Curated annotation (Swiss-Prot):
This is Hepatocyte nuclear factor 1-beta. One of its GO terms (molecular function) is cis-regulatory region sequence-specific DNA binding. It comes from Mus musculus (Mouse). It is found in: Nucleus. InterPro entries: HD, HNF-1, HNF-1_N, HNF-1_POU, HNF1_dimer_N_dom_sf, HNF1b_C, HNF_P1, Homeodomain-like_sf. Belongs to the HNF1 homeobox family.
């Protein structure tokens, strides 16, 4: 006997014997601790001192609880497998108290399951619960088992004590018979249940009738009802068969009509009955798992809300990513709009002196796109004396100050012209340098020049954001260059003096008045484009005098 005990058990026995407990007293205590035939458990504290040995002859006390919980008992996953420290649950007490034939059959079934493999029985119970959508909470409420221990026993085969397994098997046998009775109910009984439920609803709406019709016997029954209504009502749970049907219907129609929902109700109830192995005509036996039209409506509404929420999350994530990607571009600038890297000698300063000593300071950025260098002008007019120069004609000129000086004669506001220079790293044959100037200055040039030819020049209607459309403007004057040499001689090193257009506009030294054209060109949407700019190519400005009056430059779009 001693050889089968562990070292800890041997130490415990030695401690008991050394405390004064005799062999006979120890054997008697062990016999009293054995389980009784009615599944009762005798709990008695063994004496730890010799003086308490006289009290061992007292009768043992059965500690039973109605709810299956006790302060001194171990938790569901503690103790050995065959420990007897688990109190008798109410379900076992009820089964033992019944003397009917049905109770005897249930006890025989429980004994048979206890004698079989626990893991095999656990898998059978788990499959039955999944088939009928039974939550583990219901088993815990009835048997008093620990839910964590129950889940581990059903899913992993964790060892469970005999008393606990007996309670679990008792619940399983009873649940089988209960569900079988539900599905075997006749249609008449189902109608009676419907009438009873409608009567209960009327009594709920008008409680005064229930108080008047309630007799003394009914009040006693009401007092005894709370003990039977401690268990919570099972929450409705969608089965896998119904979910598959609903998801397929959701793919076809996200918001079905009432007729479609009713058809889905019949289809889901039929699938639930087939899942449980019963005829679809017995759908009323589903009980709390019965699918209704309201539940189908709520299911579709919840799916639509979930889909809308997922779409919102996706759009928020996309917008945040776009903002994150744009931050470096806003701080460092676009790679297609980097400032020009031309040498400083290309930005030589030139100054025009008019009688009023007017100075126009501007700054511009050269943007590179492909092989052509486009000059985007955004100037800030600081001091402008000619009254005909509209302050709205603001252009940005190069970063380096451009000052042009010419002695004698008044000039049109060509000082607002941008500093055009050829880039050293671009092919000059492929570069196309454009000059932008206010339309008022161009009209003054057109009035002061003397020619018989007409030439079309594309005009850009400038707005604050430089977004415009080009239109042709007719010139009826001729360019002649009697004063080109003085300008080129005064500033031989100037880059602006080498441009034909800049040399051509300096011939108006004797003109001090800005003549206005009698028939100005018509522009579309003049209210939206109050000012206009002339854009032309510096390499082709010398061809203005040679082109015929019937030719016009094609319209360009920004």
């Amino acid at each position: 006997m001693v050889s089968k005990l562990t070292s800890l058990q041997q130490e415990l026995l030695s401690a008991l014997l050394s405390s004064g407990v005799t062999k006979e007293v120890l054997i008697q205590a062990l016999e009293e601790l054995l389980p009784s035939p009615n599944f009762g458990v005798k709990l008695e504290t063994l004496p730890l001192s010799p003086g308490s040995g006289a009290d061992l002859d007292t009768k043992p006390v059965f500690h039973t609880l109605t709810n299956g919980h006790a302060k001194g008992r171990l938790s569901g996953d503690e103790g050995s497998e065959d420990g007897d420290d688990y109190d008798t649950p109410p379900i076992l007490k009820e089964l033992q108290a019944l003397n009917t034939e049905e109770a005897a059959e249930q006890r025989a079934e429980v004994d048979r399951m206890l004698s079989e493999d626990p893991w095999r029985a656990a898998k059978m119970i788990k499959g039955y619960m999944q088939q009928h959508n039974i939550p583990q909470r219901e088993v815990v409420d009835v048997t008093g088992l620990n839910q964590s221990h129950l889940s581990q026993h059903l899913n992993k085969g964790t060892p469970m004590k005999t008393q606990k397994r007996a309670a679990l098997y008792t619940w399983y046998v009873r649940k089988q018979r209960e569900i079988l009775r539900q599905f075997n109910q006749t249609v008449q009984s189902s109608g009676n249940m419907t009438d009873k439920s409608s009567q209960d609803q009327l009594l709920f709406l008008f409680p005064e009738f229930s108080q008047q019709n309630q007799g003394p016997g009914q009040s006693e029954d009401t007092c005894s009802e709370p003990t039977n209504k401690k268990m919570r009502r099972n929450r409705f749970k969608w089965g896998p068969a119904s979910q598959q049907i609903l998801y397929q219907a959701y793919d076809r129609q996200k918001n079905p009509s009432k007729e479609e929902r009713e058809a889905l109700v019949e289809e889901c109830n039929r699938a639930e009955c087939l899942q449980r192995g019963v005829s679809p005509s017995k759908a009323h036996g589903l009980g709390s798992n019965l699918v209704t039209e309201v539940r189908v409506y709520n299911w579709f509404a919840n799916r639509r809300k979930e889909e809308a929420f997922r779409q919102k999350l996706a759009m928020d994530a996309y917008s945040s990513n776009q903002t994150h990607n744009l931050n470096p571009l806003l701080t460092h600038g676009s790679p297609h709009h980097q400032p020009s890297s031309s040498p400083p000698n290309k930005m030589s300063g030139v100054r025009y002196n008019q009688p009023g000593n007017n100075e126009v300071t501007s700054s511009s950025t050269i943007s590179h796109h492909g092989n052509s260098a486009m000059v985007t002008s955004q100037s800030v007019l600081q001091q402008v004396s000619p009254a005909s120069l509209d302050p709205g004609h603001s252009l940005l000129s190069p970063d380096s100050k451009m000052q042009i000086t010419v002695s004698g004669g008044g000039l049109p506001p060509v000082s607002t012209l941008t500093n055009i220079h050829s880039l050293s790293h671009h092919n000059p044959q492929q570069s196309q340098n454009l000059i932008m100037t206010p339309l008022s200055g161009v009209m003054a040039i057109a009035q002061s020049l003397n020619t018989s030819q007409a030439q079309g020049v594309p005009v850009i209607n400038s707005v604050a954001s430089s977004l415009a459309a080009l239109q042709p403007v007719q010139f009826s004057q001729q360019l002649h260059s009697p004063h080109q040499q003085p300008l080129m001689q005064q500033s031989p090193g100037s880059h602006m003096a080498q441009q034909p257009f800049m040399a051509a506009v300096t011939q108006l030294q004797n003109s001090h008045m800005y003549a206005h054209k009698q028939e100005p060109p018509q522009y579309s949407h003049t209210s939206r484009f109050p000012s206009a700019m002339v854009v032309t190519d510096t390499s082709s400005i010398n061809t203005l005098t040679s082109m015929s009056s019937s030719k016009q430059c094609p319209l360009q779009a920004w």
